[in-house]
Amino acid sequence: MSISSPLNIDNLLLNEAKGASVKDRLVFFCIKNIYRSVGPLSMIILRRRRRISFMGFLYKSIEILGLDNSFFLVFNMPKYDYKFCSLVTRKIPNFLVQDMYASMTSHEEDVRKHFSPKKGDIVVDVGAAFGLYAIPSSKQVGQNGKVFAIEAHPDNYEVLKRNVKLNNLTNVTCLNYAVYSTKTKVKIYTNYTIMSERVISGEEEKAKEVNADTLDNILEQNKISAEQVNWIKIDVEGAELEVLKGAHNILSNSKDIAISVEIHGKNNYEPVIDLLNLYNFKIIFQKNYDWGDSQVIARHLI
């Protein structure tokens, strides 16, 4: 499917199930056809001007059938020649709509144009989620390059591995770590969706405690030389400064390197930029969002 223009998510879901397991495709086929039969009637029965959305119908059906955390759809993206599978679950409301779908629209499109690894590069993706950057990077760097996709959240990590396998990628290594400024334990907070994770302390929310380490240590443990890294992408929902603090060896020793970082919140902008300046990085691309976040790509000055 093309992601260059807005799509109706209900129509998209009604037509996209290619690549899913036979069981999931059969379940989706049945739910889809039941919806097509009863959807128009819902307006009459419930006395509504608009019928219930297919997304809501799908979530409710999955809940009733007891398929939470086990039902997958696959989105085919011929424009970029890769696929993404997505977990559809009532326990993570609107994961498919708010995160995966939104990420495949123009919000990320112009950023990816400037995120440009070349053949043979080594890319480190911190906060890889389901592979939105890691999978295209795999094709950009080719068989002589490598991509290390680091994801802290266990559920995201499982979807990431599934997507790497779905696209038959052999140059992507998936790592289940939380990246931080020191070796410690951190809480991954999940707020409404599986993608909305924040590494912060002092908030009383539902959270998963996971082991964390510095990016320098993680790469060393996986036999990745700091000097070899060409691209780092960071999207960690507010912990980007802590990630950079734990990457001293990489930032000091890698000469041919660029960093793409999504800075969450206006208060985090200056500290992140100041740290990049300290290591002699120059901003080559910046995009500011209305909600206060910024996307920055910076390259090391030789």
Protein language model features and the residues they cover:
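Hydrophobic packing residues within well-ordered alpha-helices of enzyme cores
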Residues: S137, L160, I188, V243-A247, ...
